């Protein structure tokens, strides 16, 4: 079969790109806020059944997830800048295909990285629920 694609210069592609940029920007800003809040007010282990080491393990993974979102946001901004989608200095040509491709691959790699982090967080949470009977609905604290 054929892989479904959206033509490069179509209005649908522009809509999808703008949606991607808007959602990515929102995730970047929320993650930046959440990581800052995390540093100011670190989470406390309120569950008496869960050992401190297990609690710290999951929260290090969760903090790493926010850092991955922030890194992906930075690589997304650089990717859009070197593709000419955004300009920080009017009239300056910032299009650089080599940097655009390199940062684009990095942007994609961060996506795969945070998918794996989410999987590990969920698996460790399930493991802790089974082993320690420490149930928590707050999966991404």
Predicted features along the sequence, with ranges:
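Membrane-embedded alpha-helical bundles that constitute the cytochrome b-like, heme-associated redox core
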Residues: 1-141
């Amino acid at each position: 079969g054929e892989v479904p694609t959206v033509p490069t210069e179509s209005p649908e592609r522009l809509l999808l790109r703008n949606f991607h940029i808007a959602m990515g920007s929102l995730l970047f800003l929320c993650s930046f806020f959440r990581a800052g809040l995390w540093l100011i007010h670190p989470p406390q282990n309120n569950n008496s059944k869960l050992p401190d080491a297990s609690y710290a393990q999951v929260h290090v993974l969760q903090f790493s997830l926010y850092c991955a979102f922030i890194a992906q946001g930075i690589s997304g901004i650089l990717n859009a800048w070197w593709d000419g989608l955004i300009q920080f200095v009017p009239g300056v040509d910032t299009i650089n295909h080599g940097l655009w491709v390199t940062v684009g691959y990095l942007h994609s790699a961060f996506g795969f990285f945070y998918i794996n982090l989410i999987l590990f967080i969920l698996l460790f949470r399930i493991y802790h629920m089974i082993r320690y009977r420490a149930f928590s609905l707050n999966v991404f604290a």
